[in-house]
Amino acid sequence: MDTPVWRRWLKIYIYGGSIILGGVLLFKYTTPTDEKLIASLSPELRLQYEKERKLRQEEQRELMRIVQETAKSNEPIWKTGPIDSPWEKKKGGEVVKNENFFDKIQKTRAEEAQKDELQRIREELDSLRAQSMKKTSDIVNERKSKDWWKIW
């Protein structure tokens, strides 16, 4: 004997709802928060993340400013505004090669890293020079105090 149609639909809704609810709960309780994810990183990666946070926020702010300007304009959506499109070409057919904001940020970040590395190397070199000068002066003072003609 067949069950009524409404019971079949009720089973479908119950099973479907339980699958969806189970998936949502599983996702909610198994996905780590941003803080937990950052805390689980190695110390080197966590330090790099903290250093680059300001840069990422600045990039996001600039991108949002560009998006808002583009949204206010009456131009078609495929015109990218200040961000250079890789598909836009000049009249002569050559690809436009302009440096956009994000390339400048990357270049600035690389220059800062290079300056930091040079500063670290200079400090290390200065400390090595100081150690070398100290050892040299110790050796010279030791030899001055021990003349070859003195017995004691």
UniProtKB/Swiss-Prot annotation:
The keyword Ribonucleoprotein does not apply. It is a single-pass membrane protein. Its main location: mitochondrion. GO terms for cellular component: mitochondrial inner membrane. It is found in: Mitochondrion inner membrane. SUPFAM superfamilies: Moesin tail domain. This is Assembly factor CBP4. The gene is CBP4.
